[in-house]
Each structure stands twice: as structure tokens, then as C-alpha cells.
């Protein structure tokens, strides 16, 4: 069974490229969002196995959205992986304090990396 994924990023070019890459690698990208409101709605409606959330969403904070989605009740709840072009060390304390399963640099984004994180966190769907 393919892992279903929601990608949350305010860069539309990245959304297209990430969707294409992940779908070629066997991840089912069931939705994309560029704002927190879209992410919350998509998470409730689509119920992805995992949400990839950019740390820097312009005026919005990816950490706040991650907390909302990972801590959501019922259908809004999702497992979260934080993504960024920034180095993990730049946000190490904030990442450690977040409910996210892990952090992935955008340059390291792959289907295998996502499946590996989900496996280590308690099972791939």
C-alpha cells in the first residue's frame, strides 16, 4: 500500500517538483497546500498518512502548523515531517521540541527517506 502524503509549502515550484519526485518514487501525493488554513482543511478531508511541512511558510510558522496537525483530534491528526532548505542545526532545538517525527532537508527529500522515517516511528501504513 502506498504512503499517502500532503505537502505544505508556499513555494509553488517546489510543490510541483516535490509532487513529481515523490510520485515517481511510489509516494501517493494526495494534496498540496500553501497556507495553514489549506493544510488543516486538506488534512481533515484527505487524511494523509504523513504531512510534509515547510518550516518557513512566509508569514506563517511551519512549527505552529505542525503542532496543530500532529496534535489535532480525530480526522485532523497527521504524522508530520518538517522540511526546509535551511540546515537542521539552524532549528535543532525547535525541531526537538516539535511533535514532528523528523526533519528532512529539501535536498534529501525522497520516497525512501519518508518510508524510513515512518518505519522508525512505528510502522509504514
Task: State the predicted function of each range.
Residues 63-76:
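Short amphipathic alpha-helix used as the core "switch/output" element in two-component signaling
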Residues 54:
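Active-site residues of response regulator receiver
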Residues 35-38, 61-64:
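Acidic catalytic/metal-coordinating carboxylates
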Residues 62, 95-102:
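As written
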Residues 90, 107-118:
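C-terminal output helix
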Amino acid at each position: 500500500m502506498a504512503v499517502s502524503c500532503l505537502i505544505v509549502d508556499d513555494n509553488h515550484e517546489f510543490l510541483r517538483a516535490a509532487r513529481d519526485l515523490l510520485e515517481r518514487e511510489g509516494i501517493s501525493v494526495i494534496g498540496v497546500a500553501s497556507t495553514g488554513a489549506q493544510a488543516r482543511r486538506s488534512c481533515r478531508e484527505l487524511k494523509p498518512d504523513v504531512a510534509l511541512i515547510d518550516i518557513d511558510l512566509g508569514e506563517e510558522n511551519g512549527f505552529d502548523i505542525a503542532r496543530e496537525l500532529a496534535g489535532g483530534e480525530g480526522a485532523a491528526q497527521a504524522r508530520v515531517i518538517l522540511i526546509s532548505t535551511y540546515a537542521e542545526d539552524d532549528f535543532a532545538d525547535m525541531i526537538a521540541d516539535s511533535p514532528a517525527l523528523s526533519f528532512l532537508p529539501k535536498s534529501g527529500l525522497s520516497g525512501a527517506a519518508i518510508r524510513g522515517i515512518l518505519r522508525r516511528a512505528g510502522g509504514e501504513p
